[in-house]
Regions:
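Polar/charged low-complexity regulatory segments
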Residues: 1-126, 132, 139, 156-216
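Short hydrophobic alpha-helical segments that form membrane-spanning helices or hydrophobic packing faces
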Residues: 150-155
């Protein structure tokens, strides 16, 4: 079994000012699509969610804090609900076809992750849900209920849903930094929550689009 690391930086990597609660967990991911989402986005999203929280506390305007937290929750909840609906539909398809066994995977990965906010926990849970859904898709494909094209379309669609969500969360972080800059708190924010680079072009483009949409 392969092992990988994600979001394992210590609190001193991010901020030396506060001692924050954190859970360390090992997240096992079977499917290729969930592994891609994990490796492309989890650490960067975790850093963004941490930074958003720090930046909003520095800005110190409760209405803005509540508004941003609500936007993030709504976006995560929408993807979660859609994953649940798709999972229920495909579970019914398995039941209708008398399928009650799931395949194993040849190369599952384990990721050591830090859960340092409720939103990070929710994003990790989305990846678990994605992994479960991909397992059902693969089961139906192996049993010839789904065609290869249907499998490819479904796996790509759901992988991209989470990748785009990651980009939107990073875009919200960028908007929070712009807001802090407009309030003269850029230096304080830079010290407490240094900005991380987004190496994945697709995620970076989605983040940029989110920032532009909200700034307009």
């Amino acid at each position: 079994m392969a092992e990988a690391q994600a979001a394992v930086g210590t609190s001193s990597d991010r901020s030396n000012h506060y001692s924050r609660p954190v859970f360390k967990q090992v997240l096992k991911v079977n499917s290729l699509q969930a592994q891609r989402v994990m490796e492309r986005s989890f650490e960067r999203v975790s850093n963004s969610l941490f930074s958003i929280d720090v930046i909003l506390r520095i800005i110190g305007e409760q209405d803005e804090i509540d508004q941003v937290e609500t936007v993030i929750l709504e976006q995560i909840s929408k993807v979660s609900e859609d994953l649940d609906k798709a999972t229920a539909q495909l579970n019914k398809l398995m039941e209708d076809n008398g399928i009650d066994m799931m395949p194993g995977y040849t190369n599952p990965n384990e990721y050591t992750i830090e859960i340092n906010s409720p939103q990070v926990a929710q994003f990790a849970h989305l990846i678990r849900k994605l992994d479960t859904l991909m397992g059902i898709v693969d089961t139906l494909w192996l049993n010839t209920v789904l065609t290869s094209k249907q499998r490819t379309d479904a796996t790509y669609q759901w992988q991209q849903r989470l990748i785009k969500l990651a980009g939107r969360i990073i875009g919200i972080e960028k908007r929070a930094r712009i807001s802090a800059h407009s309030k003269g708190k850029e230096g304080e924010v830079a010290e407490a929550a240094p900005e991380s680079a987004t190496g994945d072009k697709e995620i970076a483009d989605e983040a940029e689009k989110t920032g532009e949409d909200k700034a307009a």
